[in-house]
Amino acid sequence: MKTKIIVIVGPTAVGKTALAIEVAKCFNGEVVSGDSQQVYRGLDIGTAKASPEEQAAVPHHLIDVREITESYSAFDFVSEAKMTIEDIHSRGKLAIIAGGTGLYIQSLLEGYHLGGETPHEEILAYRASLEPYSDEELAHLVEQAGLEIPQFNRRRAMRALEIAHFGQDLENQEILYEPLIICLDDERSQLYERINHRVDLMFEAGLLDEAKWLFDHSPNVQAAKGIGYKELFPYFRGEQTFEEARESLKQATRRFAKRQLTWFRNRMQVTFYQIGESGVQDRILSQIEEFLDD
């Protein structure tokens, strides 16, 4: 019997953390971060980690588990998330995965992990190369590769082609979970306004100092490549004004949100909720209750 879990995804600044905490309180749950940047100690503001008060109210996992000089991959996430979910479930509690790193969450849910020597950037690039193909063209590629896909759909076709292309670097494993995947969204202009406002709040909270600390200590590590930090490095090098760097960060974050939505819409079977609609949280909680009782 597969373990039921709740998965909360969506673009940055849409309110995933707040919803995850509310779900955890209502259903005796614990939150597992599905964010590739929140694993790093010392990077708190730019990664929008749950506050110390929020983490005290509800247990959070896979936050602050790496130093900024250490790497972190989808393989690491899947391995650690599986152990964490098993521990949460063994204590009779509900695991709630919340985050915006689509590759990590999809890898966990679809029963394979990324191992071997292939960087996940190469896998992302390969996936992106398949996007322009129509369903008919994908079916032809699947046939050419000698693959058989029961109940053909686009997602299964792309996954099968990835496995065939990368060989042992994509290892099939048993699918362990029965997820309810909730994707939060907002009207585009409202979402962009939320993003701009959150960036302003981050600067008020000390983002510039946090980014400067990273720039001074480890500007070339993986942790420094995340949105929220690298956009400020030109300012530290004297190549941009502060206002130019701040606007660059806002623009990069808006573009990132758009890519996140595209990923969740095209690659995962989600239930969308518009956060601006009246009573949306009550409807989400009702759906979760029905899912858990089923």
From Swiss-Prot:
Domain of life of the native organism: Bacteria
Region described as Interaction with substrate tRNA: 35-38
Enzyme Commission (EC) number: 2.5.1.75
Interaction with substrate tRNA, annotated site positions: T101, R127
Cofactor(s) needed by this chain: Mg(2+)
Signal peptide coordinates: none
UniProt-annotated binding residues for ATP: G10, P11, T12, A13, V14, G15, K16, T17
Similarity comment: family membership: Belongs to the IPP transferase family.
NCBIfam families reported for this sequence: miaA
Record-given protein name: tRNA dimethylallyltransferase
